[in-house]
Amino acid sequence: LKGNPVGSISPSVDLYNAISLKYALPLGGEDLDAFEGDLRLRITEGGDAFTPLGEGAENDPTLPGELAYVDDAGAVCRCWNWRDGVRTALTDNTGNAFLIVECVDPERIEDCRAATEELAQLVEQHLGATIAVAELITYDHREAIIEP
């Protein structure tokens, strides 16, 4: 950050950005109601439709071998949850949000749990939200059912 303040985006994004900075873990969020079909994290074959936030309305499809969250309509996030797309972006009108904390280092699993718990508490406290599902996805526990 080099001494520069982090700008405000929206209440939900600001909350997960604060937790991301506190725990030094990647966090993200998407509009769950904008998903088409199931969300999957996978290595892409390339060509998944994706319009990135902040760069106009140009389709920028995934590349072969890229790791991305995808649904039946295309890419939701690219490079894990780093590059958000327009189609599923959180807005002031989002009714059901998908918030994610990522951690690929098994040594930091407790940090991941703590970040997830703190994010849930802040979202409930400051946004009046109800947490429907809070699960840790691992190699041995590979999926969660999320129903808005």
Predicted regions and their residues:
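RNA/tRNA-interacting regions in translation and RNA-turnover enzymes
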Residues: 1-148
